[in-house]
Amino acid sequence: MRSSRSAKVSLVGAGNIGGALAHMLGASQVVKELVLVDVAGGMTEGKVLDVGQALALLGSDVYITGGSDYAAIEHSDAVVVTAGIPRKEGMSREDLLNTNAAVVRNIAENIAKYSPGALVIVVTNPLDAMVWCMYKYSGLPANRVVGMAGVLDSARFSFFLARHMNVSVSSVSAMVLGGHGDLMLPLLRYSTVGGVPVESLIESGRLNRGDIAAIVERTRKGGEEIVKLLKTGSAYCAPAASCAHMLESYVRDKRSIMPCSAYLDGQYGVRDLFVGVPVIIGEKGVEEVVEFPLTAEEQAVFDQSVELIRGSVSAIS
């Protein structure tokens, strides 16, 4: 992969997340070139102009282009996929699965054609099933396909916990495993505040289990809460920031440990599925799956999450 000074990143899907991510990457100058691709070509070109002009004010020379032609993603170092449709009223879970699976399949085939050496970060929901689709239809190696979910879920958990304890969020380190949904598993033993495990804070009386249970539940419903408040949209700043965090570790070979939807081949007792687990992200993509010992209770919740993902994958026709 090229260095961050010459790295090219393509964003497939120029909606709110794609636009916010383009601005973040351009402002931080983590990459040299950005490409936005979307079926709505005119909208994409307008967003390119808007973001590009914002970057001019910031003194950023990141080169940004866009349109509807997939050929523009050729020779990308990384491709972020946000394209897809949200679940609409009257649409079944299976409808959403198969509609977005078709979208992801088309994107996967174009990535295989134009950028087979890229790292692909999938954001499209239902997340874990869509990452599996990308892997299946692109033919890319497993270490080059990953889903963004755990970074976002962990950020939400950290935010809520920091607010509750009235401390800097920089003092909080959280780890969330499992699928991107109601069965995500925040690991309290591996989550810390000021280096002190949350479990120890509970035992010392600084936190109580009722408060933590409420924070966990709010984290699980974090996306839904934002949708209800916005009424006409969904979260995009935090998902974009989560993608930027992953991309920085990849482009700069930082080898940061973060929870992502990654391919499991026996780790955590799971095979041939993409599930949210801690991984090391470096210049080769997913360089290692980090296995944390789980208690029987944690393993049970994790297994439920895995079965839900397996059911989603099986439902794709």
Curated annotation (Swiss-Prot):
Active site as annotated: 180 (proton acceptor)
Enzyme Commission code(s) on record: 1.1.1.37
Any GO BP annotation: tricarboxylic acid cycle
GO MF: L-lactate dehydrogenase activity; L-malate dehydrogenase (NAD+) activity
Pfam hit, one: Ldh_1_C
Amino acids binding substrate: 87, 93, 125, 156
Substrates-to-products reaction catalysed: (S)-malate + NAD(+) = oxaloacetate + NADH + H(+)
Amino acids binding NAD(+): 13-18, 38, 100, 123-125
Keyword annotations: NAD, Oxidoreductase, Tricarboxylic acid cycle
Presence of the UniProt keyword Oxidoreductase in the record: yes
Keyword Nucleotide-binding: no
UniProt superkingdom: Bacteria
Family note: Belongs to the LDH/MDH superfamily. MDH type 3 family.
Listed HAMAP family: Malate_dehydrog_3 (MF_00487)
Main function: Catalyzes the reversible oxidation of malate to oxaloacetate.
Protein name: Malate dehydrogenase
Gene (UniProt): mdh
